[in-house]
Amino acid sequence: MKKVAMLGAGSWGTALSLVLADNGHQVMMWGHRAELIDQINELHENKDYLPGVELSSSIIGTADLSEALKGADFIIVAVPTKAIREVLKKALPYIPKQSIFVHVSKGIEPDSLLRISELMEEELPEEYRKDIVVLSGPSHAEEVGLRHPTTVTSSSKNIKAAEAVQDLFMNQHFRVYTNPDMIGVEIGGALKNIIALAAGITDGLGYGDNAKAALITRGLAEIARLGTKMGGNPLTFSGLTGVGDLIVTCTSVHSRNWRAGNLLGKGYKLEAVLDKMGMVVEGVRTTKAAYQLSQKYQVKMPITEALHQVLFNGQKVETAVESLMARVKTHEMEDLVNTFENRVK
């Protein structure tokens, strides 16, 4: 049995706590809302974020970071990207020496343009940095909570740390693979939220399956293009954290990014969408960061650019779609063709 500190009492933190409890581990789930912690401890349910799912008595809620972290073998960071730095700063005085950090959030920090593992490296003491692990893949919390079959990927610079997390989570309902390509895993997980927003917009506009299929396919090309330029392995984007996560996020009503995009497609303004959602929509912040990354690495990302225009410059969604369809003609495998031609030269 391992002691696990789950930093974050949202839907994903709760669902992962359930997996860990099923595996016989003791989970201390930290959250800052006292009424939510009381729910978890007294009703054994998270009515706000994962209603209808009974939680094991081995999952204990706390609003005290020192209590959550005491003796923890693993520390799972399950808070939104924008809160990670603040939470880590508060946690620093209480981190046990033997702990392995795992992050399960999908995003990129705007302005700094850091992946989450890089952000964590800036905040954590040196002895913890080499063992940071990312757990990512096509995994809606609602389905994990119901113990539906789910597969994800564990990635780290240290393969032993990735394998330790694989062993920690893996069971008959929750299969975990390892992948040493941390860059590709994080970029795929973050950028799919952009394409999910766009997929929701096309559905909100009533454009049908043809448009969505094109969007997912060309969206994957954008993700792979940027991810490879940043040092990721191209093969990673055809795996669970690339095409797998993209499919599940672009086609499911469980996806908050898809739901937000759907509202945008139906004519809601961004502020109204975020207010109506009542939950973090990572794709909005990630769109800004990915647009900045596309400029930095000089990578063509037309879908990301179009969504950036809609979200931050007030462009109508119909106009954005028209601009995408009116782009100059090109080869579908443009990057491969250019690479081949350069080699021939």
Swiss-Prot record:
Pfam families: NAD_Gly3P_dh_C (PF07479), NAD_Gly3P_dh_N (PF01210). It comes from Bacillus velezensis (strain DSM 23117 / BGSC 10A6 / LMG 26770 / FZB42) (Bacillus amyloliquefaciens subsp. plantarum). InterPro entries: 6-PGluconate_DH-like_C_sf, 6PGD_dom2, G3P_DH_NAD-dep, G3P_DH_NAD-dep_C, G3P_DH_NAD-dep_N, NAD(P)-bd_dom_sf. The gene is gpsA. This is Glycerol-3-phosphate dehydrogenase [NAD(P)+]. PROSITE patterns: NAD_G3PDH. GO terms for cellular component: cytosol. It is found in: Cytoplasm. GO terms for molecular function: glycerol-3-phosphate dehydrogenase [NAD(P)+] activity; NAD binding. Sn-glycerol 3-phosphate binds at K106, G137, S139, K192, D245, S255, R256, N257. The active site is at K192 (proton acceptor). It catalyses: sn-glycerol 3-phosphate + NAD(+) = dihydroxyacetone phosphate + NADH + H(+); sn-glycerol 3-phosphate + NADP(+) = dihydroxyacetone phosphate + NADPH + H(+). Catalyzes the reduction of the glycolytic intermediate dihydroxyacetone phosphate (DHAP) to sn-glycerol 3-phosphate (G3P), the key precursor for phospholipid synthesis. GO terms for biological process: carbohydrate metabolic process; glycerol-3-phosphate biosynthetic process; glycerol-3-phosphate catabolic process; glycerophospholipid metabolic process; phospholipid biosynthetic process. Its main location: cytoplasm. Its EC number is 1.1.1.94. Signal peptide: none annotated.
